[in-house]
């Protein structure tokens, strides 16, 4: 399955080990992680070589090609929220995961849309 992994990049990289774990887990299960750059420890340096438009177009292209999204939402991020909304609009199923004691938005926790789920993990 083609998976879009969403996680905070500019909002903070504290969850990087978690993104790397999720990416590795999905790949080991035979899934293709299109947005693997989220789990790349060098992503900020690599993205500094791209324009904002190039980053947006790349990510939206990955999302368009995805069969589902996994969004790590423990770290508040406008970008992750935008990607989740974009996936919902495109009819792409979304699973949001978060660590215990995370302050997850009510916009996710209270969402009753059938193709979005929020799960505690860790």
Curated annotation (Swiss-Prot):
Keywords: Glycosidase, Hydrolase, Nucleotide metabolism. This is Putative 2'-deoxynucleoside 5'-phosphate N-hydrolase 1. It catalyses: a pyrimidine 2'-deoxyribonucleoside 5'-phosphate + H2O = a pyrimidine nucleobase + 2-deoxy-D-ribose 5-phosphate; a purine 2'-deoxyribonucleoside 5'-phosphate + H2O = a purine nucleobase + 2-deoxy-D-ribose 5-phosphate. One of its GO terms (molecular function) is 5-hydroxymethyl-dUMP N-hydrolase activity. Substrate binds at residues 4-10, 19, 37, 83, 105-107. The keyword Hydrolase applies. Monomer and homodimer. Catalyzes the cleavage of the N-glycosidic bond of deoxyribonucleoside 5'-monophosphates to yield deoxyribose 5-phosphate and a purine or pyrimidine base. InterPro entries: 2'-dNMP_N-hydrolase, DNPH1, Nucleoside_deoxyribTrfase. One of its GO terms (biological process) is deoxyribonucleoside monophosphate catabolic process. Signal peptide: none annotated. Its EC number is 3.2.2.-. Belongs to the 2'-deoxynucleoside 5'-phosphate N-hydrolase 1 family.
